[in-house]
Amino acid sequence: STLMRSSAASDVYKRQKRYMASSEFDKVWTSCESLLAKYHKDNPLHGGMKVAELRQKLFKGADRARADAILSCLAREGKIKSVADRYALADFEVRLTKKQNALKTKLLQIYHKMGLEVENLDDVYVQFERNELADCKQVLESLVSGGELVMLTPQLCIERRIYEDIWEKTKQHFAEHGELTLAEFRDMLGTSRKYALAVLEYYDKNKILKKDGDVRHPGPEF
């Protein structure tokens, strides 16, 4: 999980800072600042760049634990900040227009009302005026990148609070059992197969769980 990765990164923080030459650290920061500044300019409504993308662009094939420790170090020094599964420059803020803020409020109200059993995005967009659609799609991307919504599939988003509740139930299950089936997960969430499968496939894609035949086990990102 993100929390466990953060803990692991903090464990090596002092060692990382100690053996990394200040000139090398400054060089990494300069590159990081440049990458994120360009990303923010190109994507002003996104909360930040995905951690995996930043790690790959900044460190190429370097050891992942070391890369995460350096990023954690930059965050501790107030140079960058963690936003959901992304990083942003510390002083970056998403700025929405008055119209976009109104769309944001409406979108959040819609998703709050739906809970887990959400409509497809196409059906959500139908609830907006045609001339609002372009802005609406940008605002939804902003809500996903900022962590307020979690995009399970290209058509299904859920509120962050719903996702966190599901994640707690998932962790509790694996604290007591070694594997998980789709039927067990569906019953655990009290929902239909469609939504249970969407969450499981999101877990698979993000290596939180690993599918093995008809069951799933904790993955490397659990």
Give, region by region, the residue ranges found by the protein language model.
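Short helix-coil junctions and helix-kink-helix linkers
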Residues: 1, 51-64, 123-133, 184-193
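Short amphipathic alpha-helical interface segments
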Residues: 1, 29-49, 100-119, 163-182
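Single conserved hydrophobic/aromatic residue that forms the stacking wall/gate
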Residues: 2-9, 13
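Short amphipathic alpha-helical interaction segments
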Residues: 7-8, 61-70, 130-142, 192-201
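Charged low-complexity interaction tracts in eukaryotic proteins
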Residues: 11-33, 72-101, 141-168, 212-222
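Short, hydrophobic beta-strand segments
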Residues: 18-20, 49-58, 87-94, 121-122, ...
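C-terminal structural cap/anchor segments
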Residues: 106-145
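C-terminal tails and terminal domains of large nucleic-acid-associated
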Residues: 177-222
